[in-house]
C-alpha cells in the first residue's frame, strides 16, 4: 500500500472502487482502511446466496447504481432475461402479474427512484 494512499489523499473527491466479481481477499481491508466507497449493484449482489441485493442492506460507505460501464443499461437488462426480470418484478418491486415488456417509463422511474432514495446508499 504505497501508491494508493497517496492517490486517495491527493483529492477531496470521494473515491469509489469497482469491487465487483472476483476480488482479492485484501481488497475489503484496503478499502476500509482508506475509506474507499464500495460499488453496489442490485442486479449483481456480492452475497452469492441471493439473486438480487436489497438496497437497504448496502454498506454505509457505498455507491449504488443500476449498472456499470461494462453492463447493459436498465432497459437492456430488463429485456435480456424475461424469467429473471419477472422474479425481480415480483420479489424486489413487490408487484403482481406479468412484468411489462418493454420497460415502461413509469416503472424505470420507480426503479431509479428506489435507488436514489435508498439509505444509506448514495446513488449516482
Regions found by a protein language model. Name each.
Residues 1-124:
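Catalytic cores of glycan-processing enzymes that make or break glycosidic bonds
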Amino acid at each position: 500500500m504505497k501508491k494508493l494512499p497517496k492517490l486517495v489523499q491527493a483529492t477531496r473527491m470521494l473515491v469509489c472502487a469497482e469491487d465487483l466479481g472476483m476480488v482479492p481477499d485484501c481488497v475489503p481491508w484496503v478499502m476500509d482502511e482508506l475509506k474507499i466507497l464500495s460499488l453496489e449493484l442490485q442486479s449483481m449482489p456480492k452475497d452469492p446466496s441471493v439473486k438480487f441485493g436489497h438496497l437497504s442492506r448496502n454498506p454505509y460507505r457505498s455507491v449504488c447504481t443500476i449498472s456499470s460501464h461494462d453492463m447493459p443499461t436498465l432497459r437492456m437488462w430488463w429485456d435480456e432475461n424475461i424469467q429473471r426480470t419477472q422474479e425481480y418484478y415480483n420479489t424486489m418491486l413487490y408487484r403482481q402479474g406479468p412484468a411489462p415488456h418493454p420497460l415502461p417509463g413509469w416503472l424505470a422511474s420507480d426503479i431509479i427512484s428506489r435507488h436514489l432514495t435508498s439509505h444509506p446508499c448514495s446513488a449516482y
